[in-house]
A protein has these predicted regions:
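Mobile gating loops/cap/lid regions near enzyme active sites that modulate substrate access
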Residues: 52-162
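A generic signature of intrinsically disordered, low-complexity regions enriched in glycine/proline
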Residues: 26, 172-173
Length: 173
């Protein structure tokens, strides 16, 4: 963080991927001491995993599921916000009304996915993490404007603000 703060440009956008990403991001930002830089912790990996589970349940192409927001850190306590997804012109509330599936299948599956991958493979999925990092960068640089809502933990005032970001909010004007 200190090196980025001292040598990085003032309009730098820093994406922290290594877990615990939110904590690492906070430490990096505090060490950087450059309030002009934008520090984000990646939540896109969990967002992509949640979209994958939903795409199977809804029989939809994963690319049709938009606005998947993850609240919290990459852990069993995170909350994938299925209610506010958009598929076509329908919200998650309209599409998913099976509360038992949400509570018994969807939430545990998404919340425990990282552990399941490690238990199965003996390591985390570097490819999935790399794709999620690329997806986050693309979302930050998107020209879709206000309709481009994506998930990231944005560091503000030395704390984590779990928020859904609009791409134009990550750009310095």
């Amino acid at each position: 963080g200190e090196a980025i703060g001292n040598h990085g440009s003032d309009d730098a956008k820093i994406l922290v991927v290594g877990n615990p990403a939110n904590t690492n991001c906070l430490i990096g930002q505090q060490s950087a001491k450059n309030t002009s830089q934008t520090w984000m912790a990646m939540t896109m990996l969990d967002s992509n995993r949640a979209k994958s589970v939903l795409s199977k349940q809804l029989d939809e192409n994963i690319s049709n599921i938009e606005r998947m927001i993850i609240w919290g850190n990459h852990s069993p306590t995170m909350y994938p916000d299925f209610e506010n997804i958009i598929v076509g012109n329908k919200s998650g509330k309209e599409l998913i009304n099976d509360l038992s599936w949400i509570e018994d299948t969807f939430l545990p599956m998404v919340q425990q996915r990282g552990k399941a991958v490690i238990d199965s493979r003996g390591a985390s999925s570097a490819t999935s993490a790399a794709k999620a990092a690329l997806d986050t960068v693309k979302a930050c640089e998107s020209r879709k404007g206000a309709s481009n809502i994506f998930s990231a933990a944005l560091m503000t005032n030395d704390s984590v603000s779990y928020t859904h970001l609009r791409a134009h909010e990550t750009k310095k004007h």
